[in-house]
Amino acid sequence: MEKLEMIYEGKGKKMWSVKGHDDLLIAEFKDDLTAFNAEKKGSESGKGALNNKISTALFKLLKSKGIETALVDTINDTEQVVKKCKIIPLEVVVRNIATGSLSKRLAIKEGTVLPFTLVEFYYKDDALGDPLVNDEHCIIMDLVKSENDLDRLKHLGREINSILLPFFKEKGLKLVDFKIEFGVDKDGNILLADEISPDSCRFWDSVTNEKMDKDRFRQDLGSVKVAYEEVLRRILS
């Protein structure tokens, strides 16, 4: 499968058009690390390949449980073929344990187990700092077609969480929270898109609470690659 031109470059990936396949794209995972809306930047060799492998494994798991995804195939260490879809400009954040912006915003002690799964929407706009938005904001800004779409996103977020939470528990990891994105394909179907990796999730070791995700970069806690390698090892074990 031949790449043509790069049509988009984000913080963690490059997207390429594919020769002879207008309905497909190639997603290339980068080694770049960013935090605090790209105010902090770095890079760690091999990080992109690890995220590609982790995300592929988790998307395949979710697909086996009935979640429709944009993933078609992984073609090498850093690249995967995905269905072309229109990305909904919302980050869907699913939280099980308080930390990060939730703890800061509401003064909830870090590590507090939430009484139920919390689903939040953040508007994808770097210039605005990806602000938290509610259902009414989403409708006013035409980010989705209807309230039914928002209900669908919430349902999918909780359904994905219900699959991943026990999976990671068996692997000795707490799934603290995660960010997912969705797209709409040419037939109007909502698909899980982007990635699920330690770049977009918070994982804590079940025994020690050691952080094994991008918070290691955010908070200068040590090697990102070593932690991501351990996450991959546990996922595949």
Curated annotation (Swiss-Prot):
GO biological process: 'de novo' IMP biosynthetic process; cobalamin biosynthetic process
Pfam families: SAICAR_synt
GO MF, any single term: ATP binding
InterPro entries per the UniProt record, alphabetical: SAICAR_synt/ADE2_N, SAICAR_synt_PurC, SAICAR_synth, SAICAR_synthetase, SAICAR_synthetase_CS
Keyword annotations from UniProtKB, A to Z: ATP-binding, Ligase, Nucleotide-binding, Purine biosynthesis
Record field: catalytic activity: 5-amino-1-(5-phospho-D-ribosyl)imidazole-4-carboxylate + L-aspartate + ATP = (2S)-2-[5-amino-1-(5-phospho-beta-D-ribosyl)imidazole-4-carboxamido]succinate + ADP + phosphate + 2 H(+)
Signal peptide (UniProt feature, chain positions): none
Pathway(s) annotated for this protein in UniProt: Purine metabolism; IMP biosynthesis via de novo pathway; 5-amino-1-(5-phospho-D-ribosyl)imidazole-4-carboxamide from 5-amino-1-(5-phospho-D-ribosyl)imidazole-4-carboxylate: step 1/2
First-level EC class: ligase
Entry keyword annotation includes Kinase: no
UniProt EC number: 6.3.2.6
Family, per entry: Belongs to the SAICAR synthetase family.
Protein name: Phosphoribosylaminoimidazole-succinocarboxamide synthase
